[in-house]
């Protein structure tokens, strides 16, 4: 079915950005204020256990959808899309995403109410959700987690405190607003 034909079948058309990010037990280092010439002190942990957070954000409204997985592959991505599609079944979703190999495998089943727009290769800066990952990791800076369960709890608390206003202020680039206005979305 053509995209134009799909549009008439749904209540509204929504624009989302998607990406995945790895969160783990390795210490997230960020700048600290110190006296000039003094190296900042912090406890470093070099454990390499991690989890993947898959995320979708609607920059205009600040609405978001996150799901945690233990790994990054097309099977997890397909289930993630299905869960998202079931949450908003009456809307047509245009999703901007990067060119990760698992985003376009032959066997990938994309729900009918989702259309992909692939961003140019090697341009994470055009995907607004990258700024949200940075924002989340800034909350985790210099934390040392004993295990993944403690990291999960902290991450869930941070995500639960995110308001739509904050998400929109981080991810709503002016060029996106302009493009959506021109496209009448």
Task: Outline where the language-model segments fall.
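Extended, low-complexity cationic-aromatic segments
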Residues: 1-74, 78, 82, 177-181
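C-terminal anion-handling pockets and recognition modules
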Residues: 11-15, 130-185
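Acidic/histidine-rich, metal-coordinating catalytic segments
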Residues: 19, 91-103, 127
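A short acidic, often aromatic-flanked loop/helix-cap motif at beta-alpha or helix-coil junctions
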Residues: 23, 122-126, 150
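Short catalytic/ligand-binding loop motif for oxyanion handling, primarily in non-cytosolic enzymes
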Residues: 24-26, 103-105, 126-128
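Short, aromatic/basic amphipathic alpha-helical patches
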Residues: 105-113
């Amino acid at each position: 079915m053509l995209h134009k034909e799909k549009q008439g079948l749904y209540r509204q058309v929504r624009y989302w950005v998607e990406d995945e990010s790895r969160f783990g037990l390795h210490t997230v280092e960020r700048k600290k204020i110190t006296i000039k010439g003094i190296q900042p002190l912090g406890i470093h942990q070099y454990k390499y256990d991690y989890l993947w957070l898959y995320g979708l954000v609607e920059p205009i409204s600040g609405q978001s959808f996150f799901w945690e997985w233990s790994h990054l592959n097309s099977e997890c991505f397909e289930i993630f899309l299905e869960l998202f599609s079931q949450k908003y079944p009456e809307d047509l979703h245009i999703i901007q995403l990067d060119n990760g190999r698992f985003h376009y495998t032959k066997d990938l089943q994309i729900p009918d109410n989702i259309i992909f727009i692939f961003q140019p290769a090697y341009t994470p800066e055009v995907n607004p959700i990258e700024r949200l990952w940075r924002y989340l990791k800034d909350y985790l800076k210099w934390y040392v987690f004993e295990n993944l369960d403690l990291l999960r709890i902290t991450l869930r608390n941070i995500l639960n405190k995110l308001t739509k206003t904050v998400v929109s202020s981080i991810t709503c680039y002016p060029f996106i607003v302009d493009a959506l206005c021109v496209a009448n979305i």
